[in-house]
UniProtKB/Swiss-Prot annotation:
Pathway: Carbohydrate degradation; glycolysis; pyruvate from D-glyceraldehyde 3-phosphate: step 2/5. It catalyses: (2R)-3-phosphoglycerate + ATP = (2R)-3-phospho-glyceroyl phosphate + ADP. Pfam families: PGK (PF00162). It comes from Cutibacterium acnes (strain DSM 16379 / KPA171202). Gene3D superfamilies: Phosphoglycerate kinase, N-terminal domain. The gene is pgk. This is Phosphoglycerate kinase. Its main location: cytoplasm.
Length: 402
């Protein structure tokens, strides 16, 4: 993949950059600007190089039609504050306003067009429809920079098709993500420990398949742990259970044993009989051994003994990849397992990687700073697909364009 430096002198040149600004909003207030901050190094580089930069980005899922609640206005405002620049926002995506805004940029200026998902062609499965929209994006620049790692696993007009039309490069954010994550699966420093949590085993089957080959130890928490416990013949009460994945879990346990690898499962869990996920309230929380979960209770977090065992495995590693919380961390009293894992990652003497999505928001919610970890991925789905060994369309096209 080419870097921005490889594009040569950009002063006065028009550059189109795809960023991932899909930030959480409360009304029109951004509640976590991590993704905007992650884009700053490359945007600052373009600004200082004197490029005339048009930014493509999406927010939410407006389904191919204009929806004011998904406007990029809060993003443009926050980006301007962070860069101490006047960042203009066009009134449309590829219409007269976007064209005029892009064409009137001076050297070093930055503008956003509106949410690319306001255009039906952006996420279309019809290649011709995407290509037609990509032509319009390409009219905004002489070069294309891909800097939205959270979307590189999508074959979309602003990620994939436009990169075929212009000389293209990876921004520093995408380049670092690919380097770190591909390095973990190809040649990790050992011991290599993978921590997987989250609700469903089904979502992680391909990841487990690939990482069982690469990792020395697999640490399992979150809702998916109870399907593994069931596969070992234990009763899990009212806990989340992915019946369709029990056989797969049995197979993984057997494969790990045959290959001399460890799969760590909870030895104790926190259980409740009364929980309201919407209101984020919970009744009495008890700790029970993992093989004694009462039939009328739901396990909702790993227990203190498990926290210690998992922390020890993590702290002894030279490389750690973590994706998915250990429990319902959004509810007070059920964040302890996730917090213990996050704390252990900060103490790793080696590379600690937080794999985007819920894990990234969990560490920030729980008060950890980004620089306490080796790398926090900006892509949940993208980081998992890369760890599965899949070829990501938005990366493949940059490598071809080399």
């Amino acid at each position: 993949m080419k870097s921005v430096e490889d594009l040569g002198d950009l002063r006065g040149k028009r550059v189109v950059i795809r960023c991932d600004f899909n930030v959480p909003l409360d009304g029109d207030k951004i509640t976590d600007d991590g993704r905007i901050k992650a884009a700053l190094p490359t945007l600052t580089q373009l600004h200082e190089a004197g490029a005339r930069t048009t930014v493509l980005a999406h927010l939410g899922r407006p389904k191919g039609a204009v929806d004011p609640k998904y406007s990029l206005a809060p993003v443009a405002k926050r980006l301007g504050e962070l860069m101490n620049l006047d960042v203009k926002l066009a009134g449309d995506v590829v219409g007269p306003s976007a064209t005029k805004t892009s064409e009137s940029l001076a050297d070093g200026e930055i503008a956003l067009v509106e949410n690319v998902r306001f255009e039906k062609g952006e996420t279309s499965k019809d290649e011709a429809e995407r290509a037609e929209l990509a032509q319009k994006y390409a009219s905004f620049g002489e070069f294309y920079v891909s800097n939205g790692f959270g979307v590189v696993h999508r074959k979309q007009a602003s990620v994939y098709d436009v990169a075929k039309l212009l000389p293209s490069a990876a921004g520093s954010l995408v380049a670092k993500e690919v380097e770190v994550l591909e390095g973990l699966t190809a040649d990790p420093k050992r011991p290599f420990v993978v921590v997987l949590g989250g609700a469903k085993v089904a979502d992680k089957l391909a990841v487990i398949d690939n990482l069982l080959k690469a990792a020395d130890t697999l640490v399992i928490g979150g809702g998916m742990a109870y399907t593994f416990l069931k596969a070992k013949g234990l009763e899990v009460g009212d806990s989340l259970l992915d019946e369709d994945s029990i056989d797969a879990c049995t197979k993984y346990l057997e494969q790990a044993k045959a290959a001399g690898k460890q799969i760590l499962l909870p030895v104790d869990v926190r259980v409740v009989s009364d929980i309201d996920f919407e209101a984020r309230t919970v009744g009495q929380i008890d700790v029970v051994p993992a093989d004694e979960i009462p039939s009328d209770k739901m396990a909702v977090d790993i227990g203190p003994e498990t926290e210690k065992a998992y922390a020890n495995a993590i702290k002894g590693a030279k490389s750690v990849f973590w994706n998915g919380p250990m429990g319902v961390f959004e509810i007070k009293g059920l964040e302890l397992g996730t917090k213990a894992v996050a704390q252990a990652l900060t103490e790793v003497d080696g590379l600690s990687v937080v794999g985007g999505g819920d894990s990234a928001s969990a560490v920030r919610t729980l008060g950890f700073a980004d620089d306490q970890f080796g790398h926090i991925s900006t892509g949940g789905g993208a980081s998992l697909e890369l760890m599965e060994g899949k070829e990501l369309p938005g990366i493949a096209v940059l490598k071809e364009n080399n």
